[in-house]
Amino acid sequence: RIHQEIRERKAAVDERLAEMSAVVREDDTATEYAYRYIIGFDGDLKRLAAYIEDLEGVEILSLGRALELIKDLGDATTVSGQYGLTGFEGTHAIGHTRMATESDVDIRSAHPYWAYPYSDIAVVHNGQITNYWMMRRELERRGNRFLSDCDSELLAVYTADKLTNGFSLEDSLRQSIEQIDGVFTYLVATADQLGLAKDTMAAKPMVLYESDDIVALASEEVAIRAIIPQEIDTYDPYEEEVRVWQA
């Protein structure tokens, strides 16, 4: 019965994509409950997302022209195997395996976070935002929508709101340190940039290795050394540090 409902929901999604003149170029089953579409579409992504999500039981986990978000339950090896991450190609990637402390344990609350319905903005975050509800209400008054109650999502929506209103990624990261309270370290990926920001106390760990060929960041140095065989020198970003790299 469940599989039949999933097939019916996919058929409804296909129908609405056609109604919006979105051309499905490729679709496949990522898991038994998730589908991945490659479409040709020149219209309003916000309108498309709203129309698809109006279907009962259907949720868009990410939508973009350059970034692809993978969100699911399980450890890194499990999720990589489910979605074939070893076959992905690109210039930059962010990821976060975490234990949920104040949010639900479900796909919606998994990292990376997407800022609905903005294209190509993703965030991973370690920490806690203490003025979450105040900042969320302000962003909602500006017309933004939240898909969860996790404070990490606020950083994605905040960043998307700033970039949409003409701020650079570096400006957005610096302003977030001034306007958002709490202890946090977070990374932002856009179509062509990677950004880092740490709060005023730098309580949450981050280790950075940078060379002419690669930029690697992790909560623990052992994670970087696991993928770089030679001896390296790492750096711990300081409080209020902001960095942006071009992909």
Please state what every model-predicted region is.
Residues 1-247:
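Conserved short alpha-helical segments that host acidic/polar catalytic motifs at enzyme active sites
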